[in-house]
Design a protein with these regions (language model features):
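Peripheral docking tails and interdomain loops at the edges
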Residues: 2-68, 72-88, 157-215
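Glycine/threonine-rich flexible loop motifs
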Residues: 149-154
Length: 215
């Protein structure tokens, strides 16, 4: 986290860091050239620590796939991703055709993908596998709201398996209370980072994508 980016902050930084203070543009260019991931503040720093310590990988692109069991949550995540420069691209025709054969008609076969309140562990897993395999996406955000009665503790294991098979990072977004926190502990058990809001999940995805790009 580079402080002293504005003129006022730069002046204040001189009294604390001395020689490390200077024109922000110079540091930014040096960071990019060296492959340093620049963070905008402590919220992003916390997201970076959580995502990178668990995933231990970055990606060179910025195309993100969003899969959820609640349409509104998918839209919120898409907005958060777009505001950070991530690309929420439409599903390619090949992936759409394959998923249309697998998923119930009432599911939204798009990006974001809404599996609705009828989602099952298997539907989440199949959707993730097909989109990462044929969609050309670099990273996925899976938002399980735990409303659908057919979701079980096996979901975390299945999502982890598909992420490992595709060799691509998957981030979990799962807002909620005590019940949800107990469920999301299962994702962490299987090596998947969990974030409590669309904004924090999108921040984590942005950091993973930024880490794989050079100037």
């Amino acid at each position: 986290v580079k402080v002293g980016r504005s003129a006022v902050a730069m002046e204040a930084a001189h009294s604390h860091t001395g020689a490390l203070a200077g024109r922000y543009e110079v540091y930014r260019a040096a960071f990019k050239k060296a492959g340093v991931i620049e963070l905008s503040g402590y919220e992003e720093f916390i997201s970076a620590c959580k995502a990178m310590s668990i995933l231990k990988k970055t990606v060179p692109g910025r195309r993100v796939m969003i899969i959820t069991d609640g349409g509104g949550m998918g839209v919120n995540i898409a907005d958060a991703c777009a505001s950070l420069g991530l690309e929420v691209e439409p599903l390619p025709e090949k992936a759409k055709e394959q998923l249309s054969l697998l998923l119930p008609r009432f599911c939204s076969v798009a990006n974001p993908m809404d599996l609705t309140g009828s989602a099952t562990d298997e539907l989440f897993a199949e959707a993730l596998e097909k989109t990462l395999d044929t969609g050309g996406y670099d990273i996925a955000i899976v938002a399980a709201l735990w409303g659908p009665p057919a979701l079980t503790d096996e979901l975390a294991h299945l999502i982890s398996e598909k992420a490992e098979l595709a060799n691509k990072p998957v981030i979990i977004c799962s807002p909620g209370g005590v019940y949800t926190r107990a469920k999301t502990a299962l994702f962490r058990k299987y090596g998947l980072p969990v974030f409590p809001s669309p904004e924090s999940a999108a921040r984590a995805a942005s950091i993973v994508c930024r880490g794989g790009r050079r100037a």
